[in-house]
């Protein structure tokens, strides 16, 4: 399952990830998540419009292997509950031209700002979830396999629900949602 799911993510597909017990609260932390490839310039818009049925500009959060967080973000600390925000590492950013810097609003949002554009906000920040092998072994294994295939130890992670609905609880909910 890990191999096939990591390959589907690497191929640009959005995945409904359902494992173990359901999280309680507003964030999906790898138990009930919709996942995508953060390297894709189209993933943010695709997930928002075709999966979540919400405005195309709404940002997504990254799940990153704890041992690799400082490779992708200015952070080097634990954030297992997706509560902390930090900037994408400077060497992962793409410098904007003067013309791009002068853009405003939705036009600025459509500019690729980093190697992981699907989770990079306009100010280069992201709300990070660090994934630990000991506390979330299956999700960690998935991200590690994705890294093996792509060189990227980050995935897009958003709650497994559509606008106005609660996060899925049962397998039946998951099939109905996705």
PLM regions with names:
Residues 1-178:
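Flexible beta->alpha loop and helix N-cap segments adjacent to enzyme active/binding sites
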């Amino acid at each position: 399952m890990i191999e096939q799911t990591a390959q589907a993510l690497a191929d640009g597909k959005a995945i409904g990830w359902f494992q173990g017990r359901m999280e309680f609260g507003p964030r999906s932390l790898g138990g009930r998540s919709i996942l995508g490839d953060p390297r894709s310039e189209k993933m943010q818009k695709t997930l928002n419009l075709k999966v979540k049925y919400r405005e195309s500009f709404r940002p997504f959060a990254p799940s990153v292997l704890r041992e690799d967080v400082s490779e992708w973000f200015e952070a080097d600390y634990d954030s297992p509950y997706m509560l902390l925000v930090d900037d994408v590492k400077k060497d992962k950013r793409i410098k904007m031209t003067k013309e791009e810097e002068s853009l405003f609003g939705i036009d600025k949002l459509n500019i690729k700002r980093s190697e992981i554009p699907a989770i990079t906000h306009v100010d280069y920040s992201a709300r990070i979830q660090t994934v630990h092998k000991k506390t979330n072994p299956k999700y960690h294994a998935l991200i590690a396999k994705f890294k093996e295939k792509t060189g990227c130890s980050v995935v897009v992670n958003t709650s497994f629900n559509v606008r106005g609905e609660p996060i899925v609880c049962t397998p039946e909910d998951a099939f109905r949602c996705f």
